[in-house]
């Protein structure tokens, strides 16, 4: 009888050890750099999740402010939180570091100035599990940080399951699906088995998210706004600079290169052309604005022509697809500022 009781206690102990040592279901990757006023709210929203089987990887991108001091409070009080420190390399490098350190079945990215609803992980996880989907996606809300007021203009989606081709087409063309790294849950193997990393550039999400969807069997969509995107400053158009202008079209070239290497360009050529047209128009506005702000119109006509050359070059497909990042032989140049008199 005693041996039976002993065996029973041993089984309980073994199960407990297995539960304590097994990998978490979800790895949350939070890049951190200069977000001291916002990080506590972000981490509190993670700590308050109804889904508890996660690890929160806080990637310190050599943040010079007090962000990590705040993060250390969470690490000290909750074993699910940990900090990984790296030399400053930007958002993409921080995300890539987080992926390298992750062990969960799924990966979620949360920007450290944003925050999430309490059921964010639970609903995205259930959407994947119940539909046997490699990825899930939810709506999001712009949160105006200026006065702490939620903007009523939400990016709402309907509950559905998108099959592979529809999801890829929609995320490339920015039609019904946005290419942000956040507001999604990914099977970790999408990144690890296909060696997907974020390139060091602006619009790295645009250049990467279609790849993740391409390798997903399908995409489960949760029809609720569960992610809060904090708008801290001006709109994307008002903060465009020459590097962003060039990277905007280059992000499409990266996806075009990827599709051509995988023999799928023809399947999504319409979507590539649609997003090229959209970005080309955005760049026309941005180029003119750059020259107005510089009080110099010298070179503006040349820059506008270059914008069209870039778009045409990407679409002509006369360049050879490469295993790494492709080369775009054209670039818009910064206007030379005139001194105000």
Residue spans of the language-model regions?
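Glycine-rich, basic loop-to-helix element that forms the pyrophosphate-binding segment
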Residues: 1-2, 86-102
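N-proximal low-complexity "stem/linker" segments adjacent to membrane-targeting elements
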Residues: 14-45
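Single conserved hydrophobic/aromatic residue that forms the stacking wall/gate
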Residues: 1-16
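Short, acidic, metal-binding catalytic loop of nucleotide-sugar glycosyltransferases
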Residues: 44-53
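Short aromatic/hydrophobic "clamp" motif used to bind/position activated sugar donors
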Residues: 107
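Donor-binding/catalytic cores of nucleotide-activated saccharide
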Residues: 91, 112-220, 230-240
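A conserved acidic beta->alpha catalytic loop
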Residues: 52, 60-70, 87, 111
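Membrane-interface aromatic/basic loop that binds lipid-linked glycans or pyrophosphate carriers
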Residues: 18, 133, 290-341
């Amino acid at each position: 009888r005693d041996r039976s009781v002993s065996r029973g206690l041993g089984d309980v102990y073994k199960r407990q050890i297995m539960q304590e040592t097994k990998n978490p279901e979800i790895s949350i990757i939070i890049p951190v750099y200069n977000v001291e006023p916002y990080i506590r709210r972000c981490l509190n929203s993670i700590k308050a999740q109804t889904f508890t089987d996660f690890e929160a990887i806080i990637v310190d991108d050599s943040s010079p402010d007090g962000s990590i001091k705040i993060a250390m409070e969470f690490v000290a009080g909750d074993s699910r939180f940990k900090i990984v420190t790296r030399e400053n390399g930007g958002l993409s490098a921080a995300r890539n570091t987080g992926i390298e350190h992750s062990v969960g079945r799924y990966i979620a990215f949360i920007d450290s100035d944003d925050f999430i609803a309490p059921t964010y992980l639970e609903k995205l996880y259930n959407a994947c599990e119940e539909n046997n989907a490699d990825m899930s996606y939810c709506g999001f809300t712009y949160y105006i940080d200026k006065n702490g007021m939620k903007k009523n203009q939400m990016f709402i989606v309907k509950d559905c399951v998108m099959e592979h081709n529809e999801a890829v087409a929609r995320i490339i063309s920015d039609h019904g699906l946005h290419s942000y790294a956040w507001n999604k849950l990914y099977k970790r193997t999408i990144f690890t088995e296909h060696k997907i990393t974020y390139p060091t550039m602006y619009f790295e999400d645009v250049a990467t998210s279609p790849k993740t969807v391409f390798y997903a069997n399908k995409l489960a969509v949760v029809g609720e706004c569960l992610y809060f995107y904090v708008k801290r400053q001006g709109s994307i158009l008002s903060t465009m600079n020459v590097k962003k202008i060039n990277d905007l079209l280059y992000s499409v070239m990266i996806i075009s290169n990827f599709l051509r290497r995988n023999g799928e360009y023809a399947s999504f050529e319409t979507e590539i052309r649609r997003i090229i047209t959209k970005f080309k128009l955005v760049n026309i506005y941005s180029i003119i604005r750059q020259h107005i702000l510089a009080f110099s119109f010298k070179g503006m006509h040349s820059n506008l022509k270059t914008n069209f050359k870039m778009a045409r070059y990407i679409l002509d497909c006369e360049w050879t697809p490469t295993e790494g990042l492709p080369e775009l032989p054209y670039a818009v140049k910064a206007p030379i500022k005139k001194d105000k008199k």
